[in-house]
Regions:
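Polar low-complexity intrinsically disordered regions enriched in Ser/Thr and small residues
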Residues: 35-38, 46, 72, 103, ...
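Canonical SH2 domain fold
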Residues: 59-64, 69-75, 81-90
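Short, surface-exposed beta-strand/loop "edge" segments at domain boundaries and coil↔beta transitions
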Residues: 52-56, 68-69, 90-97
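Short, compact, well-ordered microdomains
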Residues: 79-130
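Intrinsically disordered, low-complexity segments enriched in small/polar residues
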Residues: 30-33, 67, 98, 103
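Negatively charged, low-complexity tracts enriched in Asp/Glu with abundant Ser/Thr
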Residues: 1-65
Length: 130
């Protein structure tokens, strides 16, 4: 990975930490698409994939702040703690504006078994998992 990509990733993580420090809410659309959930990210870690240096996993502890509109799940409520595993990866889509840049991925992250163990271990050590 080039130094420039490394620097740009750490810049993204600094921006993420700034949002946490300012308690900026994250919006996630309800699975039924008739509402949205607002979360505060309390803490996060990142973990580089061992066999893909252009991919970092993000493990977040989120607290639901509100539900706007309709929620497809009736038992969800303000104050619920949830964990999200997502990732950033360098785009390799030819001719895309994002080619060679970090892009956010949240759908079905694939992670090597040994990296999953390392990610969970780090999340426990840094008190992300409560």
């Amino acid at each position: 990975m080039t130094e420039n990509l490394n620097e740009s990733f750490f810049k993204l993580m600094k921006q993420k930490q700034d949002k946490i420090d300012r308690r900026i809410k994250t919006s996630i659309r309800d699975i039924g698409e008739a509402g949205e959930h607002k979360f505060i990210c309390e803490a996060f870690i990142y973990f580089q994939q061992s066999n893909s240096p252009e991919k970092y996993f993000i493990f977040e502890r989120l607290v639901r702040e509100s539900i706007i509109g309709f929620s497809s799940e009736k038992k969800l409520k303000k104050g619920d703690v949830e964990y999200r595993i997502s990732y950033y990866i360098v785009s390799r889509k030819p001719n895309a504006k994002t080619f060679g840049k970090w892009v956010f991925g949240q759908f079905c992250p694939m992670i090597p078994a040994e990296d999953f163990e390392g990610l969970i271990k780090k999340a426990r050590q840094e008190n992300i998992i409560i």
